[in-house]
Structure formats: C-alpha cells, structure tokens
Amino acid sequence: MAEEKVLEVKNLHVNFHTYAGDVKAIRNVSFDLEKGQTLAIVGESGSGKSVTTKTLMGLNAKNAEIPEGELLFKGRNLLDLKEEEWQKIRGNEISMIFQDPMTSLDPTMRIGKQIAEPLLKHNKGMSKADAMKRALELMQQVGIPDAEVHINDYPHQWSGGMRQRAVIAIALAADPEILIADEPTTALDVTIQAQIMHMMAELQERINSSIVFITHDLGVVAGFAHKVAVMYAGEIVEYGTVEEIFYNPQHPYTWGLLDSMPTVDSSVDRLVSIPGTPPDLLNPPKGDAFAARNKFALAIDFEEEPPYFEVSPTHFAKTWLLDPRAPKVTPSDNILARWKRWEELKGDK
C-alpha cells in the first residue's frame, strides 16, 4: 500500500541575486514527504539544506528567485501563494523549529504567552484563558517539569535544553501536518540532544505529523529518520531509506560523511575529513560538482553531470560510478563493513 504524500517537491531551483552574480543555491531538488514519516536532509554547511527548508516556509530573503519548481501541499503549489495566504499556513499547517532557541524566543515576553500566541493567531474564537490552558498542556507534553510553576518565566531563566522544548511547543501549538526542524539540537550538549530527539519521535507518533529534519550530522538521524536525502552543492546526490544510506551508500560524498562519523567501536586513531572545499555556486563546475574532491572521480565526472542511477525502487544516487561501464572502486574499510552488514540484513529478511 502506497504511503500518503503530504508534500511533493519537484525540480526546485533557488537563486540569490548578488552584486557578484546569481548564486545557484538549490539546483533541481526533488523529494516526497509521506504522512507520519521523517525525512532527514544531511550535508555540510552551504549544501543548501537551510535554503530548502526556508523555501518550504516561504521565508527566503528578498533577493531570492525561484525560476523553476513546484512545492505541492494539499494539491496547491505553495510557490504560487501570496504572503497573506502563506500566513494562514505558516505556523499552522507547516511549522518550523529553528536552530538557536535563544534567538527564536522573545526575551521580553513570558514563555507561556509566547506558546499561546500562535494559538490565538490561528484560532480566532479562542479566549486568552483557553490559549494559556493549552500552552500549559503543550509545556507538559514536551517534558518541561513543573510547567504550571514556570509558565510565567522569561527565556533567560531557562537552560538551553528547556528553551528548545519551549520552541518545540510553539511549533506544535497548531498541530501542524509538517514540522520542519532546522538543526534543532546543534546548540545542545549530547545528553540533551538525545532527550530532544526521543521526545520529538514520541510527539510525532502521537500527532502523526511529518518531519523534515535538517542536520550536518548523519549520526543524529540514525535512529530517528525513515528516509535520508544527502545534499551537496545545492543538489541531492543520494536519496534512500535510512538503512540504505547507512548500510548501502553509493555516492562518494556519502562515503565521506560516514567515514567522518566517530563510532564507539572504531579502531581508527583519527577522524577522516573530506578534502577540499565545496564549489563556488556563483559558477557551478562543469560535470559532477563533487569531482574535484572525489578521489574516485572518473574523467567523465569533469565533463558531464551524472544522472540519478536507481539502486533500488527507494534508493537513487547521482554518481557515474553506478554506470555499468564504470570501473569498480574500493572504498574505505568502514564502507566495506557497512556493505557486508547490508548483505546480512537482506539475508535476514
């Protein structure tokens, strides 16, 4: 049975006009988001992750241009909406959790009132008393202890982890169908990160919302996401289920991300990094954007952009290494071990 799609992104392109020229920040990005599922978008800084999510919220800067693409939500192309139409959807049907809770909260407003604010905005008949009652319930749902005592606190009185819980409560206030989380745990320590991720998974199951989770850290999404899109230089270079990306990765950039992840049982003395820097998107390179950093690059990588090769019906990668004519290459021992584990997983099914 096919999953219900709540969002379809098709051939999205986003440019930014600058004095130096047009920055081609997003190039031909497509993906689907299914009901109750989590899609993780992973990549280095500057890969286009945050621009993608801001486009989904209609929050790009004024110098942004979208020359091509569709964002289909409930049969409507969000790119056709006027700002007043966006305001009915933003924070209501589609909500966002931002990276830094301190800059997301108004330091001069009590936290309970900030949580109640979107309720009053999107429910015109709701009284302030009912909104505050619901705000208290939301604070309890996101695990804020003694919520009734702290509902009138100001943001500076709370720790970073508690502030992030408040931001999540605000995002969940209207029971959104889609929740976009832009690196929501980056500013938190590892223990609090795990608590926030666990809480978000529980809340998702309870309200059956769909999540787009942005991160630069593949390790964060291992036990949380259903599907993963790996972004590089404004493009999705690999897309698959979380198991396919972790245990059967096919793109050299994905290999590099996985090799740079620390693991508890690793015998490696030092972490591996991906050499070089991402390309200048004012003038994207000819061919494969990752070619200059790819030690497995073929001659064709510098001349012709690769298509998406199908690895499975749910798994695609944009690399010439998957062309039947390409030579076989040997990635790191880490990737070979993952491939071996993939064969074992397939055998268990």
Curated annotation (Swiss-Prot):
CDD domains: ABC_NikE_OppD_transporters. It is found in: Cell membrane. It is a peripheral membrane protein. One of its GO terms (cellular component) is plasma membrane. PROSITE patterns: ABC_TRANSPORTER_2 (PS50893). Residues 7-258 form the ABC transporter domain. Keywords: ATP-binding, Cell membrane, Membrane, Nucleotide-binding, Peptide transport, Protein transport, Translocase, Transport. It is an enzyme of class 7 (translocase). It catalyses: a dipeptide(out) + ATP + H2O = a dipeptide(in) + ADP + phosphate + H(+). InterPro entries: AAA+_ATPase, ABC_Ni/Peptide_Import, ABC_transporter-like_ATP-bd, Oligopep_ABC_C, P-loop_NTPase. One of its GO terms (biological process) is protein transport. Signal peptide: none annotated. The keyword Protease does not apply. ATP binds at G43, E44, S45, G46, S47, G48, K49, S50. GO terms for molecular function: ATP binding; ATP hydrolysis activity. Pfam families: ABC_tran, oligo_HPY. Disulfide bonds: none annotated. Its EC number is 7.4.2.9. Coiled coil: none annotated. Belongs to the ABC transporter superfamily. The complex is composed of two ATP-binding proteins (DppD and DppF), two transmembrane proteins (DppB and DppC) and a solute-binding protein (DppA). Part of the ABC transporter DppABCDF involved in dipeptide transport. Responsible for energy coupling to the transport system. This is Dipeptide transport ATP-binding protein DppD. It comes from Lactococcus lactis subsp. cremoris (strain MG1363). The lineage of its organism: Bacteria, Bacillati, Bacillota, Bacilli, Lactobacillales. The gene is dppD.
